[in-house]
Amino acid sequence: MLQKESVAKPIYSLTPFTLLDYPHKSACILWFAGCNMRCLYCYNPEIVFGKGTISFEKTLQFLKTRNHLLDAVVFSGGECLLHKKSIAFIADVKKLGFLIKIDTNGSQPEVLKELIQKELINYVALDFKAMPENFEKITQSKLFIPFEKSLLLLLQSGISFEVRTTVHSELINKKDIQQMIGYLGNTGYTGDYFIQHFVNGAPTIEKLGHSFKELEKENLSTEKIKVHFRGKL
């Protein structure tokens, strides 16, 4: 249980309704301020570098008005699992009867492990940024090993999850994606793999050129991993 006097404002903004972010469910999205990666293509720089404006207490008050109107709450960002009180907050939201989805870069495996052990989450979207040789360049971080730990945790957990990769054609090509698919296959992953197209024209952390969608012309799916494309802009 959160104590009111110690609650800061970790949430940058709130999307009150979506049918796109939790498979087959209605949801709202909580956008957490701050991130421990600086992905070159990130088009949420205001969230990554910005400060929160909404407290957990205010968010819970809002969610209580959405009981029986929404199925789920999506925790996104930024990186939602960075915040010290995220586990207690997720527990409070879960008690309201909502399904819980976590969008994460996988950098906090210990937090993810505790959430799994406490049975607080229902669905996870795990960002697979790149293979180790490109990971630091793309994310400006050295967090591949924590990501890998998170992936293995999810594989062992039985929780429904998806793996997704944002692609900018200047940073990731067909060979890179094929290596990533091979890596996922070697871990035992057999789910869907979503390739998210970079949104051209959006403000980003690093200035990048136009991203082309050449990958859509390729049949990248394997016997065990089906590749889907998101973003038709």
Where are these regions (language model features)?
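Canonical Radical SAM [4Fe-4S] cluster-binding loop centered on the CxxxCxxC motif
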Residues: 2, 17-55
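Short, well-ordered turn and helix-capping elements at secondary-structure junctions
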Residues: 15-18, 46, 77-79, 106, ...
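Flexible, glycine- and charge-enriched loops at secondary-structure boundaries
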Residues: 49-56, 140-144, 213
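Short, flexible loop segments at the rims of nucleotide/cofactor-binding pockets, characterized by
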Residues: 49-53, 78-79, 101-102
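A secondary-structure boundary/capping signal
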Residues: 31, 76-77
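Conserved AdoMet/S-adenosylmethionine-binding subsite of the radical SAM
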Residues: 60-72, 81-210
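Generic beta-structure capping elements
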Residues: 14, 33, 45, 129-131, ...
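Auxiliary Fe-S-binding modules of radical SAM enzymes
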Residues: 1-20, 24, 171-233
